[in-house]
């Protein structure tokens, strides 16, 4: 429900290995070949590579002066992704800018720059970046998901829904698109269709806080308070500070007659996200419902 760094924003990591090797025959002949290859591996990263190590690897590659222009663009893009993952958006965005300057035909850094702007709350700049990514690659499902996320933040729910539809058409296995469409359909009142989208995601992703949160909203809007509490609680087990799940659970508890528990949840949600009661009013849910 709540768009955050962990929800609906999809970054693109470009594989630099082959490009960097092909771009620098001299590096392959250098006594420091092992360092160079090691930095490629670090910059490409994996789930087990720390963000700091990825940044160090990309920085070393950039400073080496080796590789093609395209490879250098990839290194900047990958370092920007690592900075974004660390929450250092003011460093990430200049890296994406530099990647775009070096390789303006690559859609990935445009997508990633948009993701950073989205996290900063600069929605118009994010939208511009995603538009450019899609212009360069009209089949870029991840960029459609991210652009839909901007439309959600701008309360343009119909446009968001169409974006998720297109992302699913392009990449049917993209869970973020199904989860995002579930939430958007729940807001728009297409509750059965929303439920089907959420259930599809939760069949394969048991730890998806956002989708549990979205399904909780569906149950709340259909008057199933117990089911809503269960789903909001599942979301909070994964993400204890998810304000929308706290607020939704609070409403469900109030409807079940648990005033003390409901008030505690709602107060906690408001402490995390001011104005969340206004958000829920836009979603068609009020405390008095």
Residue ranges of model-derived segments:
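Structural signature of tandem alpha-helical TPR/SEL1-like repeats
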Residues: 51-52, 87-98, 120-132, 154-166, ...
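Conserved alpha-helical positions within TPR/SEL1-like repeat arrays
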Residues: 44, 74-84, 97, 108-119, ...
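Bacterial N-terminal signal peptides
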Residues: 11-24
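Structural marker of alpha-solenoid helical repeat scaffolds
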Residues: 64, 68, 102, 136, ...
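Terminal, low-structured helical/coil segments at or just beyond the last alpha-helical repeat
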Residues: 31-39, 254-289
């Amino acid at each position: 429900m709540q768009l955050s760094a962990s929800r609906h924003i999809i970054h693109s990591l470009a594989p630099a290995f082959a490009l960097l090797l092909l771009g620098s025959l001299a590096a392959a002949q250098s006594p420091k070949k092992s360092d160079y290859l090691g930095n490629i591996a670090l910059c490409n990263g994996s789930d087990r590579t720390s963000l700091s190590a990825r940044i160090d690897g990309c920085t070393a590659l950039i400073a080496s002066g080796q590789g093609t222009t395209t490879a250098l663009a990839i290194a900047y893009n990958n370092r920007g992704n690592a900075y974004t993952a660390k929450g250092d958006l003011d460093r990430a965005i200049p890296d994406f800018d530099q990647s775009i300057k070096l390789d303006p035909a690559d859609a990935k850094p445009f997508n990633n720059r948009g993701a950073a702007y989205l996290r900063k709350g600069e929605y118009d700049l994010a939208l511009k970046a995603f538009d450019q990514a899609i212009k360069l690659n009209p089949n870029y499902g991840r960029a459609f998901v991210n652009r839909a996320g901007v439309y959600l933040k701008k309360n343009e729910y119909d446009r968001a829904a169409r974006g998720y539809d297109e992302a699913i058409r392009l990449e049917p296995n993209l869970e973020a698109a199904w989860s995002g469409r579930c939430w958007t359909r729940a807001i728009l009142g297409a509750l059965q269709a929303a439920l089907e989208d959420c259930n599809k995601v939760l069949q394969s992703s048991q730890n998806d806080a956002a989708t549990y949160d979205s399904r909780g909203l569906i149950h709340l809007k259909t008057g199933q308070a117990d089911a809503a509490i269960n789903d909001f609680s599942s979301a909070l087990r994964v993400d204890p500070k998810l304000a929308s799940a706290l607020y939704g659970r609070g409403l469900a508890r109030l409807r079940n007659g648990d005033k003390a528990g409901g008030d505690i949840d709602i107060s906690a949600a408001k402490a995390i996200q001011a104005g969340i009661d206004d958000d829920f009013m836009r979603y068609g849910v009020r405390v008095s419902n």
